[in-house]
Amino acid sequence: MKLVIFRSLMALFLITTMISCSSGKSGNEVSNPSNSQTTPVATNVAATQGKIQFKTEGGTELFALKQEADGAKLVDGKNQELARIKADKSGKIKIKNAAEKVLGYVVNENGEWKLKDANQSQDLYIFRTQNNGGYTLEDAAKKEVYRIQATKDGFEIATPDNKSVYQVKVKEGKISLRKTPTKTIFSTKSQLSPIAFTCFGFDVLTREQQAGLAYAVNLTGGK
């Protein structure tokens, strides 16, 4: 009789254990889908990085930087691709045209950004910080092309003899490039540091070079 009772208890124990394991497995299967949703969330964040649009005072789009996961794409007002800007494995910013031809590089070293040729054999321009809080753009011979000084509401781009070229004005979330206080060349309401925006006022550079330099400067906030 005792043997029969013992066998009954063992059978009941085994059944209870099997049910418990089965329930645990079901719980895990239910929780897995919620864990797999973490990756799409990160993807969605990257996907919301929209366009940095540069518009005339009348609202016409002149050009834009389309932010991508590994860089940016420069397009004109008709959404035609002009250049691709990407950081390579070494941290250099590579500038290519729509046909994948390398146009140049931007290298950030110790508070200066060097615009190099496609072969990386020559420094074309150097954008560097100054001890007074300003910046300079120099050519390959290290001769000043522009002086950039901070103002109460942005920056001023001037020649080496201090003749004003452009003013960069920051007001109510809008950054404007102005020839005079009343003449706006273009502006943006997109997220871009004012000093990075200033690079688009360097007329000695091509638009592709301006965009590559602005992208590199924006990554570090101009530091």
What kind of region is each of these model predictions?
Residues 24-223:
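Intrinsically disordered, low-complexity proline/glycine-rich segments
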Residues 1-9:
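Bacterial N-terminal signal peptides that target proteins for export
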Residues 17-20:
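C-terminal motif of bacterial Sec signal peptides marking the signal peptidase cleavage site
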